[in-house]
């Protein structure tokens, strides 16, 4: 009995050459619908699926291969005499190769289609054949990825058959694909109906292996969401090397921080912590303000902009060593300047941050929560003195920055410049002292969480702070309010805490 391959693919790249190869090895081909037509038109001797099933395609193509004469041929164990006896009695031909790629649900779910249109891209017959073939991998070669055509061809050329090791790997690829495919469908169907479902289905596809992880002895890779076109899976690399693991984490924060602001803004960042943040009339002004606050820490840093980068800004940036620049666009002459630094990673972003959930792994579990996308609940002035309009503008600026600083976090600012940033401390007074020491001339102070004691207010007064913004909610809020009144400082509560761990 001749060996037989069943080919049914949506993506036809490479399938014609692969089919020709199979035919050259005396393997007959069965196919369906559009694949059958494509192979036939290109001179391949191919059997249409309904010649096997004696049953026509029906329901607008929804039912083509869902038939015992197909699946028995895939699932029969060749060494099982009873299985083979049934096939012989029923005149069922074994299927030795299953070549299937799926309807592009991953792509279509992100397009501007109706719910019903997206549902039509949920593949049923394809996954069923793939799963059957993958289960019976000892006897069936299953190909779900066009990149594996050459792998199979090479083994058949060299060894006359596909090794059990390779068949098992191809089987694993199928179930890996199906878990992502089914996960994407589950998330699509559940939508907002169940915010935290019983089973967490995450669907990500590998973008690339990374040179190493957070440290050189750790291996790493980066995966892209199949459901969402976010900032970090759609950017273009215009210059420089591939991003490292640490680059990915840092760029994410720099881009998010810069995009907190409506006006032109720049965020300079090192080790996942902002070291300079400023707004200005344009990218150049914002960058220079951020740079001048801390020209030491910015060295080797990540720079995020929310506006196009011009030549003047580029000329300033290439004066120092930087790892990455992230912006929505670049003038041509600016790009020419930046490309003089061959290792400088220059990224063009197409999407503003849009994540609604974030996940963190702990040993044996994953924590899932809403992204911290809300800045304030409401502004409530709690002191005798009210902040001026300029102070209020700076207070909101400071709160936008402090969101991105590791807790406990304090930011002091003036005129749209984060003059002092203190964070990552186990009490609140230390980051206050750090921020004030660096932030000479600051007039406002922003805190990511409430004050447990009045000591922060007293320190702020010593440092010349005129207004404070914090979430409120401490049992001793009144002590801090009284301290502000004593020092003539305005203070507002926001109702929202911004811990970052």
Curated annotation (Swiss-Prot):
Q: What is its EC number?
A: 2.1.2.3, 3.5.4.10
Look up keyword Ion transport and say if it applies. no
Which InterPro entries does the annotation name?
AICAR_Tfase_dup_dom_sf (IPR024051), Cytidine_deaminase-like (IPR016193), MGS-like_dom (IPR011607), MGS-like_dom_sf (IPR036914), PurH-like (IPR002695)
Q: Where is the MGS-like domain?
A: 1-144
This protein's GO cellular component annotations are: cytosol
UniProt keyword terms in alphabetical order: Hydrolase, Multifunctional enzyme, Purine biosynthesis, Transferase
Q: Which reaction does it catalyse?
A: (6R)-10-formyltetrahydrofolate + 5-amino-1-(5-phospho-beta-D-ribosyl)imidazole-4-carboxamide = 5-formamido-1-(5-phospho-D-ribosyl)imidazole-4-carboxamide + (6S)-5,6,7,8-tetrahydrofolate; IMP + H2O = 5-formamido-1-(5-phospho-D-ribosyl)imidazole-4-carboxamide
Name the Gene Ontology biological process terms. 'de novo' IMP biosynthetic process
Query: Entry's Gene3D superfamilies?
Result: 3.40.140.20, Methylglyoxal synthase-like domain (3.40.50.1380)
The entry lists its GO molecular-function terms as: IMP cyclohydrolase activity; phosphoribosylaminoimidazolecarboxamide formyltransferase activity
Q: In which pathway does it act?
A: Purine metabolism; IMP biosynthesis via de novo pathway; 5-formamido-1-(5-phospho-D-ribosyl)imidazole-4-carboxamide from 5-amino-1-(5-phospho-D-ribosyl)imidazole-4-carboxamide (10-formyl THF route): step 1/1; Purine metabolism; IMP biosynthesis via de novo pathway; IMP from 5-formamido-1-(5-phospho-D-ribosyl)imidazole-4-carboxamide: step 1/1
Q: What information about domains appears in the record's comments?
A: The IMP cyclohydrolase activity resides in the N-terminal region.
Family named by the database record: Belongs to the PurH family.
Q: What is this protein called?
A: Bifunctional purine biosynthesis protein PurH
Q: Which organism is it from?
A: Clostridium botulinum (strain Eklund 17B / Type B)
